[in-house]
Amino acid sequence: VPNTSPETNVIAYRAAEQLLDARDPRGALKLLDPVITAHPENTAARLLRARAFFLAAQLRAAEQEFQLVIEREPDNAFAHFALARTLQRANRNAEAVRHFRLAAALDPRPDYLEAARFEQSP
């Protein structure tokens, strides 16, 4: 295990954000794994890792991370929305609907509301 400090963890987290923005989810995952090993309670790092798993099409791992974030922060609208997108991508639309609706209820942003409404139609 490499030596980590709060500073190196922040640098790794920020670099992982940049890699995700550059569409390099695997690179982001490599940076985030040691951060989460050192700080498993860090919800922001877990949320970023869940997004990386999603972009890497590792849907089961993404689902597990988003679920963990929701367990810790049940009012995190983005986590519900992202979990819904993950479930939708895995063709689990019935499960996705619940999380789209929760996201819209927690934060009535237009994209969340649109997704919740869209998912209600047959």
Regions found by a protein language model. Give the residues of each.
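Alpha-helical segment of the N-proximal tetratricopeptide repeat
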Residues: P6-A38, L55
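Structural signature of tandem alpha-helical TPR/SEL1-like repeats
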Residues: A22-K30, A56-L68, A90-L102
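Residue-level recognition of tetratricopeptide repeat
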Residues: E17, R51, R85, F118-E119
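Terminal, low-structured helical/coil segments at or just beyond the last alpha-helical repeat
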Residues: P2-S5, N9, V97-P122
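Structural marker of alpha-solenoid helical repeat scaffolds
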Residues: T4, A38, R72, R89, ...
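Start-of-helix register in tetratricopeptide repeats
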Residues: V10, A44, A61, F78, ...
